[in-house]
């Protein structure tokens, strides 16, 4: 019997907080000679797995005696020679055929041909944690990627893509960012915190304990697919110059707020805070329009974001760690702020409104500052103590299959800094020209797409919401002032 590729190892508690699904996207590469280029990623994949064999692994229930119920592990493939890299030839299709979003009627099926696995993994047998599909088109290459999200987070995805590209370059690719030793060391740091949960934090809201996944998962899938028929997916872009100008306006209002100064705070917001808040603000404006008396808005609105903790601990997690080094930021803001009724039982909103009025700014700008500052303040609480408390809480969960996401109105994943466009595949391929995400299936799911190289920078956002809400969002005067409902190709240099 041959020696396994690697020894099986258990997932961390943070890995178990992620629902079972694949993160999927594809990268496009216009190339003059497809026949030559198609061999490059195939050879690169073999080199890649030889150096990092755990990426050929499968996710399955842990079989070690005495482990907690629900504990999952990564184990080597049961059979040798199962390819991580698949190849498909599309002799009658070009890159342009793949670039249009399929929107509601086709439920993203236009993209499925270029992706290696479906969105939902099977739960009754071991499933691969990483797959790539090489699609040979008439005028280029499409690389379809799939990563099991219970094993790999967005930062890890970017690292894997860059290292995969290095292996595609062959001997000249240079050293990898991922090392087997750092993976083991980082998992150990995330597995043990050295103390009880901090009583200041209520982790039940972020990670409530529910019943294990029901046996009728197929029924759940069908419900989600039917619901997806009512959704619309759209790409938007915001020029970075407009983001920077609006951020400076908001930070100026914060610096000029006497009340915030009196509290001894030195408030500021980042570009990411601002983009998330602008989307959050405009979505609630169009979901609960003032002229529609038939829609009664809730008392508040909530958002959930994943926060990279690699640099937030006193003993930092290695930046090349590819597992889930994320905790959830969950923040709620009173609906009065979104509907420009600042001051209704909201002292912070009243402060922002008074400062904006004194500076001659618009009411929606005051609301934006109020919302962005709430996000920034919550982000500032996610430090070493908070992360260790989360880890300790998860260590005490009796059955890891019961850990779930708390409910929120919007889920936003920022891939802005994962570095996908920095990946250089060399040879006949070079850098990717575009990244595409399949149409979304869930109302209120958004991705801030990776930063591009070039002289015309912008923020790209992949938005999935109800069809009627999408129409109103596109027409919203604030959103339209900063965005264009165009494909992200407009953000790159022509």
Swiss-Prot record:
Record pathway: Secondary metabolite biosynthesis
Keywords from the named record: Acyltransferase, Transferase
The keyword RNA-binding is assigned to this record: no
GO MF: acyltransferase activity, transferring groups other than amino-acyl groups
Recorded superkingdom: Eukaryota
EC assignment: 2.3.1.-
InterPro entries the record matches: CAT-like_dom_sf, Plant_Fungal_Acyltransferase
Pfam families attached to this UniProt entry: Transferase (PF02458)
Signal peptide annotation: none
Stored PANTHER family: O-ACYLTRANSFERASE AUSQ, TRICHOTHECENE 3-O-ACETYLTRANSFERASE
Function statement: O-acetyltransferase; part of the gene cluster that mediates the biosynthesis of the indole diterpenes penitrems. The geranylgeranyl diphosphate (GGPP) synthase penG catalyzes the first step in penitrem biosynthesis via conversion of farnesyl pyrophosphate and isopentyl pyrophosphate into geranylgeranyl pyrophosphate (GGPP). Condensation of indole-3-glycerol phosphate with GGPP by the prenyl transferase penC then forms 3-geranylgeranylindole (3-GGI).
Membership in a protein family: Belongs to the fumigaclavine B O-acetyltransferase family.
Complex and partners: Monomer.
The protein, known as: O-acetyltransferase PC-16
Species name: Penicillium crustosum (Blue mold fungus)
Phylogenetic classification of the source organism: Eukaryota, Fungi, Dikarya, Ascomycota, Pezizomycotina
Gene: PC-16
């Amino acid at each position: 019997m041959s020696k396994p590729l690697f020894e099986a190892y258990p997932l961390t508690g943070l890995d178990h907080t992620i629902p079972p699904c694949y993160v999927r996207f594809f990268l496009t590469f216009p190339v003059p000679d497809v026949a030559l280029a198609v061999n490059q990623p195939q050879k690169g994949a073999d080199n890649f797995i030889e150096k990092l064999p755990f990426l050929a692994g499968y996710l399955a229930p842990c079989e070690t005696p005495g482990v907690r119920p629900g504990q999952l592990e990564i184990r080597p493939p049961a059979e040798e020679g199962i390819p991580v890299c698949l190849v498909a030839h599309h002799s009658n299709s070009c890159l342009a055929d793949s670039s249009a979003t399929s929107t509601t009627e086709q439920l993203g099926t236009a993209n499925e041909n270029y992706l290696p696995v479906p969105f939902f993994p099977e739960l009754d047998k071991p499933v691969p944690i990483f797959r790539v599909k090489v699609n040979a088109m008439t005028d280029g290459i499409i690389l379809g990627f799939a990563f099991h999200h219970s094993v790999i987070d967005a930062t890890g995805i970017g690292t894997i893509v860059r290292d995969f590209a290095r292996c595609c370059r062959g001997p000249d690719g240079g050293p990898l960012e991922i090392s087997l030793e750092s993976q083991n060391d980082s998992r150990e740091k995330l597995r043990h915190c050295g103390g009880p949960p901090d009583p200041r934090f209520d982790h039940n809201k972020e990670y409530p304990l529910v019943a294990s996944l029901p046996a009728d998962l197929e029924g759940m899938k069908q419900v989600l697919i039917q619901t997806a028929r009512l959704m619309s997916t759209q790409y938007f872009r915001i020029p970075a110059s407009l983001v920077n100008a609006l951020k400076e306006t908001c930070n100026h209002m914060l610096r000029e707020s006497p009340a915030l100064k009196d509290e001894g705070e030195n408030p500021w917001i980042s570009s990411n805070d601002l983009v998330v808040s602008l989307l959050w603000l405009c979505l609630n404006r169009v979901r609960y329009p003032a002229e529609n008396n038939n829609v009664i808005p809730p008392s508040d609105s909530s958002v959930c974001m994943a926060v990279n903790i690699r640099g937030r601990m006193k003993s930092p997690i290695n930046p090349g760690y590819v597992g889930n080094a994320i905790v959830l930021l969950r923040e709620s803001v009173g609906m009065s702020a979104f509907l420009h009724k600042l001051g209704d039982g909201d002292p912070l909103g009243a402060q922002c409104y008074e400062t904006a009025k004194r500076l001659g700014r618009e009411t929606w700008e005051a609301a934006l500052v109020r919302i962005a500052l709430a996000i920034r303040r919550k982000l500032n609480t996610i430090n070493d103590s908070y992360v260790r408390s989360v880890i300790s809480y998860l260590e005490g969960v009796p059955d890891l299959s019961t850990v779930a996401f708390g409910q929120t109105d919007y889920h936003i994943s920022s891939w802005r800094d994962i570095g996908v466009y920095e990946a250089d595949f060399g040879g006949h391929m070079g850098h990717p020209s575009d990244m595409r995400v399949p149409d979304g299936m869930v109302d209120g799911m958004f991705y801030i797409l990776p930063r591009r190289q070039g002289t015309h920078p912008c923020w790209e956002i992949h938005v999935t919401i109800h069809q009627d809400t999408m129409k109103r969002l596109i027409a919203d005067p604030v959103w339209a002032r900063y965005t264009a409902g165009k494909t992200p190709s407009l953000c790159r240099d022509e």
